[in-house]
From Swiss-Prot:
Name listed for the protein in its UniProt record: Hatching enzyme 1.2
GO CC terms, sorted: extracellular region
Annotated tissue distribution: Expressed in cells of the hatching gland.
GO terms assigned for molecular function: metalloendopeptidase activity; metallopeptidase activity; zinc ion binding
Cofactor: Zn(2+)
Catalysed transformations (reactions): Hydrolysis of the inner layer of fish egg envelope. Also hydrolysis of casein and small molecule substrates such as succinyl-Leu-Leu-Val-Tyr-|-7-(4-methyl)coumarylamide
Keywords: Disulfide bond, Hydrolase, Metal-binding, Metalloprotease, Protease, Secreted, Signal, Zinc, Zymogen
Enzyme Commission number: 3.4.24.67
UniProt-annotated catalytic positions: 164
Species: Danio rerio
Residues that, per the record, bind Zn(2+): 163, 167, 173
Cofactor note: Binds 1 zinc ion per subunit.
Domain named Peptidase M12A: residues: 65-263
Length: 263
């Protein structure tokens, strides 16, 4: 890690500590899950959630009647310096260890895009990162206090934090793209009863970017399967293409953020 990246993370941690004072000291490193993709981890954690969720981890705001974010009202605003500031606070329930993971996730956006997550002062619209009962977020800016949930027992990983924050910037799951049927096959008979609605296509702005099998926002092959190991999503024409990952934002994920916000 170079000096600038290290400094960035230290500054982020300082901001997090100002948002809510640290109450305990723990080791700074947390490992990502080694055997499952991010979506599988999220869905497993969210099984016990009392929140009404769409596509596994998306909250439908009360001021919208569908998962639609078509106009600029649900995007975060760019300032005079062409920087998109997203005010946020972090719950005091998170440990210093948790906050370092969140800071790491935020630093990826700062290093690769014009998005800047800034500690909230008096801004009316802001993200509140909280230890709720699951991993979830709304799509885009909803107005006022906007909860991004990262449950301490299953969601505090850099990749999951990036995934949920990317939802908050306005991005859907990759397999929800309007043109997805050209790239994946949905195996409807393998989907758990009552879960098919999670595979509906959305009216998306694909920004003239290619379908990204490697997107951080893509379901894994067995999402919502009726039994373990059954594929609910199969890449086409090459069924062996890997989908679902845990590392973090892909190059195309980053490209789309920059295109959407005119970075």
């Amino acid at each position: 890690m170079d000096i600038r990246a290290s400094l960035s993370i230290l500054l982020l941690l300082f901001g997090l500590s100002q948002a809510s004072p640290l109450r305990e000291f723990e080791a700074i490193f947390v490992s990502e899950p080694e055997t499952v993709d991010i979506t599988t981890q999220i869905l497993e954690t969210n099984k016990g959630s009392s929140e009404v969720l769409f596509e596994g981890d998306v909250v439908l705001p009360k001021n919208r009647n569908a998962l639609i974010c078509e106009d600029k009202s649900c995007f975060w605003k760019k300032n005079a310096n062409n920087i998109v500031e997203v005010p946020y606070v972090v719950s005091g329930e998170f440990s210093i260890n948790d906050k370092s993971v969140i800071a790491n996730a935020i630093s990826i956006f700062h290093a690769q895009t014009c998005i800047r997550f800034v500690p909230r002062s008096i801004q009316a619209d802001y993200l509140s990162i909280e230890n709720k009962d699951g991993c979830y977020s709304a799509i885009g800016r909803t107005g006022g206090k906007q909860v991004v949930s990262l449950n301490r027992k299953g969601c505090v990983y850099s990749g999951i934090a990036q995934h949920e924050l990317n939802h908050a910037l306005g991005f859907y799951h990759e397999q929800s793209r309007s043109d997805r049927d050209q790239y994946v096959r949905i195996n409807w008979n393998n989907i758990s009863p009552g879960m098919a609605y999670n595979f509906l296509k959305q009216k998306t702005n694909n920004q003239n970017t290619p379908y990204d099998y490697g997107s951080l926002m893509h379901y894994g092959k067995t999402a919502f399967a009726i039994q373990p190991g059954l594929e609910t999503i199969t890449p086409i024409p090459d069924e062996n293409v890997q989908i679902g990952q845990r590392q973090g934002l892909s190059k195309i994920d980053i490209l789309r953020i920059n295109k959407l916000y005119g970075c």
